[in-house]
Amino acid sequence: MCHQQLVISWFSLVFLASPLMAIWELKKDVYVVELDWYPDAPGEMVVLTCDTPEEDGITWTLDQSGEVLGSGKTLTIQVKEFGDAGQYTCHKGGEALSHSLLLLHKKEDGIWSTDVLKDQKEPKNKTFLRCEAKNYSGRFTCWWLTTISTDLTFSVKSSRGSSNPQGVTCGAVTLSAERVRGDNKEYEYSVECQEDSACPAAEERLPIEVMVDAIHKLKYENYTSSFFIRDIIKPDPPKNLQLKPLKNSRQVEVSWEYPDTWSTPHSYFSLTFCIQVQGKSKREKKDRIFTDKTSATVICRKNASFSVQAQDRYYSSSWSEWASVPCS
């Protein structure tokens, strides 16, 4: 992640005494200190400067302790562990003048920590963010999992390309599901994003980048995902399934329609379909048929069910969920 360099001036609250850019501004009055995390690590020296023209009678405190850490317009601290992070405030005469929140981003053995989000391991290991699109409109949804329930905040940024980024607007992050996994509870968060100038029929040359900032208490982590819309397409299931018995035959004619959410015109944005008839027993062999049409003739026995799913006809992205209807 590319971080904006802090501008050092008399009104800045925090600046770094190291040339290695180990501190950067996440948002107003919130700073991330990047630390190599190993025993006896030296940490990072940070100098805090009070945002005031006053020079005398200034004191510093950390969080709500009230303990005076030092006096003067500046305070130099050595940040080594989470006990050194938190909200630093400068005061004069009982009045708070300015403050800054320091968060820690850990790096162990050259790898940034990934303690907040759960590895979903699909489609591969170290998959923390998953994204899907129902069509080629430039709208997509991303989600992630965590077992943490409190003191947790997320923010999301997205763009197409990184060197000359094009706009993608993301909404608010929401808690979309809660599940019990053994002895643990799992929380799913999601966000919906829309490419500002999407052209559904155009060839994608640059990938979309999604960046999630995660803060748990005083710990900061970031997670990224890069993809083309065509790679994350997953249509909604086909709709309006209907069965029509054929006279003097064990067969039925089944028909369905494209999902409402799929891109149009369908002559250009075409789907292919997989159909199957499932008997009452789940162990019973299922015969699957692939077709580009929206109807088929099958044998549909009593107590069985007919199912159909859809996939982009010209690109091997994900299949939709199944849509089903009973045979009788």
UniProtKB/Swiss-Prot annotation:
InterPro entries: FN3_dom, FN3_sf, Hematopoietin_rcpt_L_F3_CS, Ig-like_dom, Ig-like_dom_sf, Ig-like_fold, Ig_sub2, IL-12
Disulphide bridges, residue numbers: C50-C90
Glycan-bearing residues: N125, N135, N222
Signal peptide: 1-22
GO biological process: interleukin-12-mediated signaling pathway
Compartment list: Secreted
GO cellular component labels: interleukin-12 complex; membrane
One of the Pfam families matching this protein, by short name: IL12p40_C
Domain Ig-like C2-type: 29-106
Chief localisation class: secreted
Gene Ontology terms, MF aspect: cytokine activity; cytokine receptor activity; interleukin-12 alpha subunit binding; interleukin-12 receptor binding
Fibronectin type-III domain segment(s): 237-328
Alphabetical UniProt keywords: Cytokine, Disulfide bond, Glycoprotein, Immunoglobulin domain, Secreted, Signal
Nucleotide-binding as UniProt keyword: no
Family: Belongs to the IL-12B family.
PANTHER family to which the protein is assigned, alphabetical: INTERLEUKIN-12 SUBUNIT BETA, INTERLEUKIN-12 SUBUNIT BETA-RELATED
Function text: Cytokine that can act as a growth factor for activated T and NK cells, enhance the lytic activity of NK/lymphokine-activated killer cells, and stimulate the production of IFN-gamma by resting PBMC. Associates with IL23A to form the IL-23 interleukin, a heterodimeric cytokine which functions in innate and adaptive immunity. IL-23 may constitute with IL-17 an acute response to infection in peripheral tissues. IL-23 binds to a heterodimeric receptor complex composed of IL12RB1 and IL23R, activates the Jak-Stat signaling cascade, stimulates memory rather than naive T-cells and promotes production of pro-inflammatory cytokines. IL-23 induces autoimmune inflammation and thus may be responsible for autoimmune inflammatory diseases and may be important for tumorigenesis.
Quaternary assembly: Heterodimer with IL12A; disulfide-linked. The heterodimer is known as interleukin IL-12. Heterodimer with IL23A; disulfide-linked. The heterodimer is known as interleukin IL-23. Also secreted as a monomer. Interacts with NBR1; this interaction promotes IL-12 secretion.
Name by which UniProt lists this protein: Interleukin-12 subunit beta
Organism of provenance: Macaca mulatta (Rhesus macaque)
Lineage: Eukaryota, Metazoa, Chordata, Craniata, Vertebrata
Gene it is expressed from: IL12B
